[in-house]
Amino acid sequence: IIVSGAGLPTELPEYLKGFKTKMAPIVSSVKSAKVILKYWDRRHNATADMIIIEGPKAGGHLGFSVEELESELDYDNEIQGIIDVVKEYEKKYNKDIPVVVAGGISDKNKVKHAFDLGAQGVQVATRFVPTKECDADENYKKEYIKAKKEDIVIVKSPVGMPGRAIKNKFMEKVINGEKFTPKKCLGCLARCNPKEIPYCITERLIYAAKGKTDEALLFCGADAYKVNKITTVK
């Protein structure tokens, strides 16, 4: 199965012709769900095998404006609207298209709420980071445990989208206008001028993976502050 985010994968069905690989686009709005499903239907005579709805409480890059993220928008209606869009294509293609809700799923009540809205599954990331089973660096896990609600902020990314991350020493400097010009451009983004960006996102995510948390971009979900110790998935 290919889960595709950071934009709408308009030509994905073309690449998968003749294969049994399943397609699961990530959407954040009724509009984006309508666009990708309509495009696939008309251009490729195909539809999704699963839809993942990533809401405004998710970590990392987000498909919302900064204003939307700061307004605490009520997202339930959007989820139900996307589910209604999916039902049209379930009927047309005579197949089940499970809808999975992601973003802010931090406890059983959030899971139940997602199912009550009509979802068939949930996607959880942040809650599993501070666990023994997670293979993230221990320093990275500790940042989640130390984080308070006010430490979790919306940040500007070189990718051009807002994101949610922990405000550490590095991010405080970025917020205050300091720039970190990369020593070497890796060419990971098509539209990126190393002289203009506040920092190299690849470089800072590598620091996170290596546990250099004072220098890293520490993406997290909105509820990261709710965990105060390393637990186990079991």
Give the positions of each predicted feature.
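Active-site entrance/lid segments in N-terminal catalytic domains of soluble metabolic enzymes
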Residues: 1-93
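Conserved active-site-proximal phosphate/metal-binding subdomains
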Residues: 58-100, 106-234
